[in-house]
Amino acid sequence: MSRKSVIQRNLKRISICNRLKNKREELKAIIKDQSISMNDRFLAQVKLSKLPRDSSYIRIRNRCLITGRPRGCYRKFKVSRIVLRQLGSIGQIPGLTKSSW
């Protein structure tokens, strides 16, 4: 299991990203818009760079909700492959059945 501080750091990044998502999108739209003056686009770039690094969705790591495992995590279920197998075998995940042919 991952350290609790690492899991909490990722949760903090998720909350910061959700809070500043609209502001980032607005600034990026200004930067990409060619009809706006170069000076205004530059000021938007400066404002974007002043935002916290953790407000970018790139910094969020997809982790298992139960164990905090960073790799082998299924997005649909938000759990790792190991936990998915355990929960699936005891029937805790609705609609998930063991394959047989």
Swiss-Prot record:
TM helices/strands, residue ranges = none
> A GO BP term, please?
translation
Q: Which SUPFAM superfamilies match?
A: Glucocorticoid receptor-like (DNA-binding domain)
Q: Spell out the Gene3D superfamilies in the cross-references.
A: 1.10.287.1480
| UniProtKB keywords | Ribonucleoprotein, Ribosomal protein, RNA-binding, rRNA-binding
Against Pfam families, the record matches this protein to:
Ribosomal_S14 (PF00253)
Q: What does UniProt give as GO cellular component?
A: cytoplasm; small ribosomal subunit
**Is the keyword RNA-binding assigned to this protein?**
yes
* Molecular function GO labels: rRNA binding; structural constituent of ribosome
RNA-binding listed as a keyword: yes
Question: What InterPro entries does this protein's entry cite?
Answer: Ribosomal_uS14, Ribosomal_uS14_bac/plastid, Ribosomal_uS14_CS
Q: Which family does it belong to?
A: Belongs to the universal ribosomal protein uS14 family.
Known function: Binds 16S rRNA, required for the assembly of 30S particles and may also be responsible for determining the conformation of the 16S rRNA at the A site.
- Subunit details: Part of the 30S ribosomal subunit. Contacts proteins S3 and S10.
Q: What is this protein called?
A: Small ribosomal subunit protein uS14
Q: Which organism is it from?
A: Ehrlichia chaffeensis (strain ATCC CRL-10679 / Arkansas)
Taxonomic lineage per UniProt? Bacteria, Pseudomonadati, Pseudomonadota, Alphaproteobacteria, Rickettsiales
Q: Gene name?
A: rpsN
